[in-house]
Regions:
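Bulky hydrophobic/aromatic packing residues
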Residues: 11-12, 16-17, 60, 114, ...
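An N-terminal structural lobe/cap that precedes and organizes the functional/catalytic core
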Residues: 1-105, 199-229
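Hydrophobic/aromatic-lined pockets within catalytic cores
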Residues: 65, 69-70, 74, 78-79, ...
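Active-site-proximal alpha-helical scaffolds that flank and shape metal-associated catalytic sites
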Residues: 78-81, 87-159
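Short, hydrophobic/amphipathic alpha-helical patches that form generic packing surfaces
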Residues: 19-29, 105-121, 180-184
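Long, hydrophobic, amphipathic alpha-helical segments used as structural scaffolds
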Residues: 77, 119-126, 130, 168, ...
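An amphipathic alpha-helical core segment
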Residues: 131-219, 223
Length: 229
C-alpha cells in the first residue's frame, strides 16, 4: 500500500518526509538483509541541537517512523476490520478452490492493494505527485542510507530509480493487474504463485468483489490528503 501511506500522511513542503513514507517497505523489498534499521535512533541524532543535526534527514526519519506507526493503527482500524469481515468467508471459500495459498496473509495484502487502487482511481493526479516526490529525493535516500550504514546502497538506488521510473502503480486502475501484483508478492515471499492465470474469470470475479467492498467501506471511512500549499 505504497500510495496509501503517501496519500494519508502527506505533509505540505516536506518532500523528504513524504518520500520516506514508503521507506520501510521498499527497504524490505529491495534489500531484505538490510531492512531492520533503527529509524528512531537516526531520527534522534539528526534532530535540532544534536551533533548530526540535519532538518532534511530528520524529516526523512520522521517519515519512516510515521509509516511504522500508521501500519500499527491501520491493522487495528475499523476500516480494515470491516473490509476483512465482509470478505473473510468469500476468501476462505475461494482460496482453496483457486489454489491461492495462505488465506489470511493473502486477503490482508489484497485489501491493502485494493485501497491503493481505490485512491488511485479517485486521485490520479496525486499519484503523479507521489512519483515526482520520489524522484526529487534520490540524494536524500542515498545520504540517509549512508548514515544508517546500509551496505547495498547502489543496489537499493538502482531498484529505487526503476520503481519511480516504471510507475507501476498506474496499472492498479486495472483489477487484472491487482491479481498480477499479488502473484508477484507471493513469488517474493516464496509462496506458490502458480495459481495466477491472466484474465481468469473466477480470479477476476474475486478481485471485483473485494474491490466493491473496499469502495463501500471507504465511503463510510473516507481517506483525505492534506492540501498541497
Amino acid at each position: 500500500n505504497f500510495f496509501s501511506h503517501f496519500f494519508v500522511d502527506f505533509q505540505p513542503k516536506k518532500p523528504s518526509f513524504n518520500a520516506a513514507l514508503i521507506a520501510p517497505d521498499i527497504l524490505r523489498n529491495f534489500t531484505p538483509s538490510q531492512s531492520k534499521l533503527h529509524f528512531d535512533h537516526f531520527q534522534q541524532i539528526t534532530s535540532k541541537g544534536q551533533p548530526q543535526e540535519d532538518p532534511i534527514l530528520n524529516d526523512f526519519f520522521n517519515g519512516c517512523l510515521q509509516h511504522i506507526q500508521r501500519d500499527k493503527e491501520f491493522h487495528q482500524s475499523a476500516l480494515f476490520q470491516e473490509i476483512y469481515q465482509l470478505q473473510r468467508s468469500n476468501w476462505q471459500l475461494m482460496c482453496p478452490k483457486l489454489k491461492i495459498p495462505r488465506f489470511w496473509f493473502t486477503l490482508h495484502v489484497v485489501i491493502e492493494i485494493m485501497i491503493d487502487s481505490y485512491l488511485i482511481n479517485n486521485h490520479l493526479e496525486k499519484l503523479q505527485l507521489f512519483y515526482t516526490t520520489l524522484e526529487s529525493q534520490q540524494e536524500t535516500y542515498r545520504t540517509a542510507l549512508e548514515l544508517m550504514g546500509h551496505d547495498q546502497i547502489d543496489h537499493f538506488m538502482e531498484r529505487y530509480t526503476r520503481f519511480y521510473t516504471n510507475q507501476y502503480l498506474f496499472h492498479y486502475q486495472d483489477l487484472e493487474r491487482v491479481g498480477f501484483a499479488l502473484h508477484k508478492i507471493h513469488e517474493q515471499v516464496k509462496l506458490d504463485s502458480s495459481w495466477y492465470i491472466p484474465n481468469n474469470i473466477e480470479q477476476l470475479a474475486l478481485w471485483k468483489s473485494t474491490y466493491a467492498d473496499v469502495c463501500l467501506v471507504l465511503a463510510k471511512y473516507p481517506l483525505e490528503m492534506k492540501p498541497i500549499r
